[in-house]
Each structure stands twice: as C-alpha cells, then as structure tokens.
C-alpha cells in the first residue's frame, strides 16, 4: 500500500500540528499492583511496519524505537499549560492530592473523560497480538481497541484487519508506561510515538486514548488534550489479567458472574485485554453473554472515530 499525501497532510503527520484544531476500580489495590499484561518486552520492536521516510526526516531516526522512545519536541505543546503536580507511582496514592483528579488513585473523572456507555460494551487493551485474530473471528459487531504502538508496528496486518472491519482503534501509549510516574517529556514521547505508529500503519490519527493502568491525572490530561486526545476509562473491570497469575485474585467463573450482573443494568464500559490467548478466550465467553448489541466508544458519546484519516 502506498500512502498518497498532499503537502498539508504531510505537515500534519510529521509535526502533529493539525491536532491543535481538535482539540472505577473494584479490586483491592494491592492485587492491582501485580498486573502482568504480557506485551512483548523487547530491546527493540521486531518491526514489520516500515519506518517511513517522513518520520525519519523529522526525528533523525532510521527505525522504530525500543520500549523507551526518545522525546521529540513538538511546537504545539505548551508546557505552561501543564500543572506542576509531583510524579508518583502506583504505591503512593496516599500522597496524591485530590485536586489532581487521579482516576487510578481517587476514581476521579473530568468532564471530558468517557467512563461509561448507555449500552454495556466491551473494550480491549494491549493489542494487537497474535491472539487478537481469534477475537476478531468471533466479533459480529464493532468494538473498541486501545493498542500499544510497539505492538502496532509488529502486527500491522492485524491492525489493518481491525481497521478494515470497522473497529475503533485508540491509543494506549507506545509501551504501556504508568504515566503519572514519568516526566512531561516522557509522557509526550509515549503519546507521539503511539500516534506515529498509527499514522504509519493505518493512515489515521487517533481521537481516543486509554491510559495504562488507568493512570491519569490533570497533569497527564493537560498533555494528552494538546494532542487532541480524549481519555477513555471504564466503570466495569474484569481483572482478566489476574487469570495469568499463579495466585489469581478472581476466578473465571466469578468474572462471568460479574458480567451477568452488569448485563442486568445493560450499561457501562468493560475493561478487557486481547494480549493473550487466555484473556481472549474469556473475552469470547463474555461476548456470548452480552451479545452483539454493543457500541464503540465514539458511538457511546456521539463523537468522531478519528481526528484525521489519510487517503491511501
């Protein structure tokens, strides 16, 4: 596939300058700290999406970065608009001020955060992975996937299949970093490289963003908003990742019973993962319980799918 871009589109992708135009957990926190999402931990991504010439010219690099992507300054990011909250990790929520509106620590949401839906709907994090294809084979409706940039460039065929079948794809950062614990520059790097992975693989720029571990506060929001991104959280957590642990905090049957209970109300966004075969098998069982009357995040709130889609 050869991308056909006009001058304005090319400038928009390279500098992300077009983005300025668009501009509840249920388990014990100690259990949550054991998360193992099992996305590929590599020194350098096993690249399958070619590193585009326009990105090489802009960044000075020749290949996709490893798990710690370099910060590339962007002229539209206004650091004066970013509040000066202290960085914190997942083990120190007691020191996080309430006015920072931390979702992970205080279950706080802002006016533009999406955290529920009028139809009970599944959402999937951490892909694309080899297991994602099994889930796609099952889905008879459009769903929302929040993809890691490092996985997008390794599985462009799966990413493009999701796109072709009408699923909504949002950013989940480049390499699954807990954003409140890193500098402003590192947050920007995680976002910009995830967007560039989507640009290069799917010819589009995301509107929707889900922070890894639900780690978002008003410092993180002040940065992601400048990219035109809107945060998507959740009000139903399956804790499916815990099934990968030797000492799981919840059983599969308990998860399925929770879904049955949630389905009685018929509303909400469910957090799941398509990163492993085990979580995908569970997702298929959940899908059978809920059925096909589900919505993408954009349809839940009557929003757009993407900020920009480039012709190919």
Swiss-Prot record:
Coiled coil: none
Domain NodB homology, chain residue ranges per copy: 118-307
Keywords recorded for this protein, A-Z: Carbohydrate metabolism, Cell wall biogenesis/degradation, Chitin degradation, Chitin-binding, Cobalt, Disulfide bond, Glycoprotein, Hydrolase, Metal-binding, Polysaccharide degradation, Signal, Sporulation
Post-translational modification comment from the UniProt entry: N-glycosylated.
The enzyme's E.C. designation: 3.5.1.41
Sites where the protein binds Co(2+): 126, 172, 176
Catalytic activity entry: [(1->4)-N-acetyl-beta-D-glucosaminyl](n) + n H2O = chitosan + n acetate
Record flagged with keyword rRNA-binding: no
A Pfam family: Polysacc_deac_1
Glycosylation site residues: 142, 181, 199, 246, 263
Signal peptide: 1-44
Record-linked InterPro entries: Glyco_hydro/deAcase_b/a-brl, NODB_dom, Polysacc_deacetylase_ArnD
Compartment(s): Prospore
Superkingdom of the source species: Eukaryota
Cofactors named for this entry: Co(2+)
Temperature dependence: Optimum temperature is 50 degrees Celsius.
Biological processes per GO annotation: ascospore wall assembly; chitin catabolic process; polysaccharide catabolic process
pH dependence of this protein's activity: Optimum pH is 8.
Residues reported in the UniProt entry to bind acetate: 125, 213
UniProt keyword Cell wall biogenesis/degradation, yes or no: yes
UniProt record similarity statement: Belongs to the polysaccharide deacetylase family.
Protein task: Hydrolyzes the N-acetamido groups of N-acetyl-D-glucosamine residues in chitin to form chitosan and acetate. Chitosan is a component of the spore wall.
Subunit structure: Monomer.
Identification of the protein by name: Chitin deacetylase 2
Species of the source: Saccharomyces cerevisiae (strain ATCC 204508 / S288c)
